[in-house]
Amino acid sequence: MAQAKKGGAPKKGQKTRRREKKNVPHGAAHIKSTFNNTIVSITDPQGNVIAWASSGHVGFKGSRKSTPFAAQLAAENAARKAQEHGVKKVDVFVKGPGSGRETAIRSLQAAGLEVGAISDVTPQPHNGCRPPKRRRV
């Protein structure tokens, strides 16, 4: 017998619970910039995500996700969502080697968020995993 699943999309006529507006004046912006995508998450001081956006979420596909312009739009989108929750000041944590790092920080400032400390938290291996092989074009 098939059992009813919990969660999922609400059925027609059912009321959905509206996500409550948090009032967080100070937060942290985590920018993860890889070679393929850029993800911007804005969290409260405890680390709970308030707003997020990524290059793919904004509407880019394929190799265009890795461009600085896509990172700029993702950061603006996340900043706009976070400002609805009352975020005014953020500390920025940047991770990864991607091309959208600086652009994302600049667009957070341009969107109206006050940027405090900027720190690079890219993980450095102490000779851990073998890196991918060199590309030969």
From Swiss-Prot:
Residues 8-21 have a biased composition (Basic residues). One of its GO terms (biological process) is translation. Keywords: Ribonucleoprotein, Ribosomal protein, RNA-binding, rRNA-binding. One of its GO terms (cellular component) is ribonucleoprotein complex. Residues 1-30 are annotated as: Disordered. GO terms for molecular function: rRNA binding; structural constituent of ribosome. The keyword Lyase does not apply. Pfam families: Ribosomal_S11 (PF00411). InterPro entries: Ribosomal_uS11 (IPR001971), Ribosomal_uS11_bac-type (IPR019981), Ribosomal_uS11_CS (IPR018102), Ribosomal_uS11_sf (IPR036967). The keyword Ribonucleoprotein applies. Located on the platform of the 30S subunit, it bridges several disparate RNA helices of the 16S rRNA. Forms part of the Shine-Dalgarno cleft in the 70S ribosome. This is Small ribosomal subunit protein uS11.
